[in-house]
Amino acid sequence: MDERRTLAWHETLEMHELVAFQSNGLIKLKKMIREVKDPQLRQLYNVSIQGVEQNLRELLPFFPQAPHREDEEEERADNPFYSGDLLGFAKTSVRSYAIAITETATPQLRNVLVKQLNAAIQLHAQVYRYMYQHGYYPSYNLSELLKNDVRNANRAISMK
């Protein structure tokens, strides 16, 4: 296999998904830990935060190897985070319903789960459209998509 100087498109997109998911998760963990009073649970949050920060630090050096990446930063409010978190929730819901349906033997329950799966798919589409229209998820512009990942990961890491 030859040595490439850039990542392949498919691995770049997988990296994007991981970094976007973990960045939103890290922001959520850092916001939520403030409310956690139980010392043992708080320690679990700290371990999780440190682990995700390390994951992001290990993945970020690969971003310059992504194909056609441009360097330009811009600041954004929390709307990208909240909408990204909602998109992740919708995506996870779709996956969870799909898995549950494959494990369901009762037709009535299956019908309810299919209905709920379709609702989750619709929610995902609505949130995606919102994010795309507002420039939070530039899915057809890989350079912008990756810049957002880097910005969000760095924001999540530096957040106190």
UniProtKB/Swiss-Prot annotation:
Q: Which GO terms describe its biological process?
A: sporulation resulting in formation of a cellular spore
Query: Which miscellaneous remark does the UniProt record hold?
Result: Present in an increased level in yabG mutant spores.
Keywords from the UniProt entry: Sporulation
Family indicated by similarity: Belongs to the CotF family.
Q: Which Pfam families match?
A: Coat_F (PF07875)
Record carries keyword DNA-binding? no
Q: Which InterPro entries match?
A: Ferritin-like, Spore_coat_CotF, Spore_coat_CotF-like
Task: Name the source organism.
Answer: Bacillus subtilis (strain 168)
Q: Which residues form the propeptide?
A: 1-4
Subcellular localization: Spore coat
Work out whether the entry's keyword set contains Endoplasmic reticulum: no
State the name under which the record lists this protein: Spore coat protein F
Disulfide bonds, paired cysteine numbers: none
Give the source lineage, highest ranks first: Bacteria, Bacillati, Bacillota, Bacilli, Bacillales
> PANTHER family of this UniProt entry?
SPORE COAT PROTEIN F-LIKE PROTEIN YHCQ
The principal location of this protein is other
PTM (free text): Generates the two 5 and 8 kDa components of the spore coat, after proteolytic processing.
